[in-house]
Amino acid sequence: MAGAHSNPSWSRHLFKAVLMVLGALLLVHSASAQTHREFASPGQQKRESSADILTEIGRSLKETLDTWLGPETMHVISETLLQVMWAISSAISVACFALSGIAAQLLSALGLDGEQLTQVLKLSPSQVQTLLLWGAAALVIYWLLSLLLGLVLALLGRILGGLKLVLFVAGFVGLVRSVPDPSTRALLLLALLTVFALLSRLTGSRSSGTHLEAKVRGLERQIEELRGRQRRAAKIPRSMEEE
């Protein structure tokens, strides 16, 4: 039963990870291209366009998606996303300009150079779009790194658990064979067992806590389902009595 439940969960996590990788590559490619257009000088654009790895990855990924979904479908999706992103970026740009104007007036009233200090808030829609794309890419990459680190830590936990057991068995055999005095042997074995128990408690507390939390959540969902069934079952006799 455990294997039957673990395989679909692992496949779902893998599918989500693949989708997030594709999304991250698309976002980073779009953000990189937008950055070159908005924040770089024309000479820098010419120098970096030929040696941009993200651009090559984005082109390859776009060709792959065109093959899978079709050029027309990808064109419709990209145009829709661009229109939505441009509308959001325009609204944020207008808000930034309004905020910069208010802040400039307040700073000027205080005797400061408000126009110069609020220049950073005057973002065009294209610049806002670039910042949003990089922010979305950063969030996706953060999620991927969290997932990868979770898998690595889980694997390291298994490896450390096996290594801990091997070291305990080796220490146990070494103590039994090398310590002739029964009293000293008993004390050393007690110390070894204490260390092993403490390590087991420290390393297993987090995993057991998350496992218990998952069980509690499952029980809460089952209780809610039972309550819903009881309510529906209680409504049926009332409706029959009214009829």
Curated annotation (Swiss-Prot):
Pfam family, one: BRI3BP
Gene Ontology terms: cellular component: monoatomic ion channel complex; nuclear outer membrane; sarcoplasmic reticulum membrane
Compartments, as annotated in UniProt: Nucleus outer membrane; Endoplasmic reticulum membrane; Sarcoplasmic reticulum membrane
GO BP of this protein: cellular response to gamma radiation; intrinsic apoptotic signaling pathway in response to DNA damage by p53 class mediator; negative regulation of programmed cell death
Sequence ranges on the Cytoplasmic membrane side: 105-135, 206-243
Catalytic activity: K(+)(in) = K(+)(out); Ca(2+)(in) = Ca(2+)(out)
Protein name: Voltage-gated monoatomic cation channel TMEM109
Lineage of the organism: Eukaryota, Metazoa, Chordata, Craniata, Vertebrata
Function: Functions as a voltage-gated monoatomic cation channel permeable to both potassium and calcium. Plays a role in the cellular response to DNA damage.
